[in-house]
Amino acid sequence: MGLNPQLVVILLFFLECTRSHIHGCDKNHLREIIGILNEVTGEGTPCTEMDVPNVLTATKNTTESELVCRASKVLRIFYLKHGKTPCLKKNSSVLMELQRLFRAFRCLDSSISCTMNESKSTSLKDFLESLKSIMQMDYS
């Protein structure tokens, strides 16, 4: 009893979908992430002066997957109630873009566990610019 041809096609489709391109993202996901980052780092975007944990500073042993994991944890803050600062509450479009960015990060391999050192902080703008640089390196 073998597999029927339709089942083989479906299994191959799922295998292709789960294959890791660049940390699990295909070019379209990376393009979407970079597009969102371009929007939220644009000139005059409100709320980007707020402080977030500075998690994108890499040491010698830090892998790119770990940096992405940390960045995802920072972006997750904007889904939680305490991450919605008065500025973001007044500028819901920025909040929605940050939440959209977090959702776009789901294509990234989240199977690793990472820790965040929250003792140092940076501006949201600097965090997003650093994240954009990392994503653009993957895209090129």
UniProtKB/Swiss-Prot annotation:
PROSITE patterns: INTERLEUKIN_4_13. The keyword ATP-binding does not apply. One of its GO terms (molecular function) is growth factor activity. GO terms for cellular component: external side of plasma membrane; extracellular space. Keywords: Autophagy, B-cell activation, Cytokine, Disulfide bond, Glycoprotein, Growth factor, Secreted, Signal. Cytokine secreted primarily by mast cells, T-cells, eosinophils, and basophils that plays a role in regulating antibody production, hematopoiesis and inflammation, and the development of effector T-cell responses. Induces the expression of class II MHC molecules on resting B-cells. Enhances both secretion and cell surface expression of IgE and IgG1. Also regulates the expression of the low affinity Fc receptor for IgE (CD23) on both lymphocytes and monocytes. Positively regulates IL31RA expression in macrophages. This is Interleukin-4. It comes from Mus musculus (Mouse). The lineage of its organism: Eukaryota, Metazoa, Chordata, Craniata, Vertebrata. The gene is Il4.
